[in-house]
Amino acid sequence: MRTLWIVAMCLIGVEGNLFQFARLIDAKQEAFSFFKYISYGCYCGWGGQGTPKDATDRCCFVHDCCYARVKGCNPKLVEYSYGYRTGKIVCENYNRCKRAVCECDRVAAICLGQNVNTYNKGYMFLSSYYCRQKSEQC
């Protein structure tokens, strides 16, 4: 399974906190849940456009919007500190950028965990053809 993880990270191009985001997702679901979201709907994975397909995809849309708000912080590259207190993910950074990016990832991981029942395998590796609509505003 470790080899699969390494291969997947190479294929999608690991950047700074992507591994951290994956661990937060796994903390709110079962191990290796992150793989389900590598290319899902119109927003889970790299980039995004169109209308989110379901609540799961909307979590990724909101995450993209959150990253857009902290753009000056290089959200895909910044590494942050986090921990767990009474079963909850807690961002442990005093640096504004690190804390903001951690919060984006924390909220998205919680959202994905709360909406796992909306996950539709039919939206995995969805063609961009189905995401051609004008994107919603953040």
Swiss-Prot record:
Tissue specificity comment: Expressed by the venom gland.
CDD domains, per the entry: PLA2c
Cysteines engaged in disulfide bonds, as pairs: 42-131, 44-60, 59-111, 65-138, 66-104, 73-97, 91-102
GO MF terms, alphabetically ordered: calcium ion binding; calcium-dependent phospholipase A2 activity; phospholipid binding; toxin activity
Residue numbers annotated as active site: 63, 105
Reactions listed under catalytic activity: a 1,2-diacyl-sn-glycero-3-phosphocholine + H2O = a 1-acyl-sn-glycero-3-phosphocholine + a fatty acid + H(+)
SUPFAM superfamilies associated with the record: Phospholipase A2, PLA2 (SSF48619)
Residues that, per the record, bind Ca(2+): 43, 45, 47, 64
Alphabetic keyword roster: Disulfide bond, Hydrolase, Lipid degradation, Lipid metabolism, Metal-binding, Secreted, Signal, Toxin
Segment forming the signal sequence: 1-16
InterPro entries documented for this protein: PLipase_A2 (IPR001211), PLipase_A2_Asp_AS (IPR033112), PLipase_A2_dom (IPR016090), PLipase_A2_dom_sf (IPR036444), PLipase_A2_His_AS (IPR033113)
Subcellular location field: Secreted
Pfam families, per database record: Phospholip_A2_1
GO CC annotation: extracellular region
BP term (GO), one: lipid catabolic process
Details of cofactor binding: Binds 1 Ca(2+) ion.
EC numbers, comma separated: 3.1.1.4
Family stated for the protein in its record: Belongs to the phospholipase A2 family. Group II subfamily. D49 sub-subfamily.
Physiological role: Exhibits high hydrolytic activities and shows strong preference for the anionic micelles (dPPC with deoxycholate) to the zwitterionic micelles (dPPC with Triton X-100). PLA2 catalyzes the calcium-dependent hydrolysis of the 2-acyl groups in 3-sn-phosphoglycerides.
Protein name: Basic phospholipase A2 DsM-b1/DsM-b1'
